Amino acid sequence: MKGKFIVIEGIDGCGKTTQIDEISRWLPTSGLMGKNSKLIKTREPGGSLLGKKLRNLILDNNKNNKPSSLAELLLYSADRAEHVSKIISPALKKEDWVISDRFSDSTLAYQGYGRHINLEIIKNIESIVCQGEYPDLTIFLEISAEESILRRKNFVPDRMESEGINFLQKVNEGFKLIAKEKKWKVISATQNITAISNEIKETLLKTFRN
């Protein structure tokens, strides 16, 4: 019996990190996990040791280091291949639970809908790098591109966060299309933090309670 794999998706500023921290505190006491199961909290890019180095390279805001769209796609894919091999698959095989800030559908949204790379090319690459590991549940925290920018106005942006509102709107629309196609749980991230957390917890209980 494998563990469970949960992914939180959404554009920057939607509150993924805050909610993952809250859910990570709650899940081990929820009664959902096995007695000997551990909870692994991770992220993309940067979930593995190699991934941390790739993250610095991918998100470097130095314009002289900006990769081409195809190179960017392949860097994210390399990060994911290592992430699955070294972190996700081993944890699930041990019946541990994994909660990740982003997974493969972020690549479809950002590099596919945002960068206009052919979606079938991305899907073919992802079918290799994911190695058969796909989320048991994906939750999409939805906010507008305008709200995302407003929330991040006092932070120093990385390269992806510096792309501007037009790019972000395309990515967000991509996420909405993917969410509809794959029947994700969509939660409005304009609510207060507690309301969002409660909705996520209810979703987890409905999905995984025996």
Curated annotation (Swiss-Prot):
GO BP annotations listed: dTDP biosynthetic process; dTTP biosynthetic process; dUDP biosynthetic process
InterPro entries the record matches: P-loop_NTPase, Thymidylate_kin-like_dom, Thymidylate_kin_CS, Thymidylate_kinase
Q: Does the keyword ATP-binding apply?
A: yes
Give the GO cellular component terms, alphabetically: cytosol
Keywords assigned: ATP-binding, Kinase, Nucleotide biosynthesis, Nucleotide-binding, Transferase
Q: What reaction does this catalyse?
A: dTMP + ATP = dTDP + ADP
Disulphide linkage map: none
Q: What is its EC number?
A: 2.7.4.9
What's one Pfam family here?
A: Thymidylate_kin
Question: Which residues take part in binding ATP?
Answer: G10, I11, D12, G13, C14, G15, K16, T17
Q: Which Gene3D superfamilies match?
A: P-loop containing nucleotide triphosphate hydrolases
One GO molecular function term?
A: ATP binding
Family classification: Belongs to the thymidylate kinase family.
Q: What biological function has been recorded for the protein in this entry?
A: Phosphorylation of dTMP to form dTDP in both de novo and salvage pathways of dTTP synthesis.
Q: What is this protein called?
A: Thymidylate kinase
Q: Which organism is this protein's natural source?
A: Prochlorococcus marinus (strain MIT 9515)
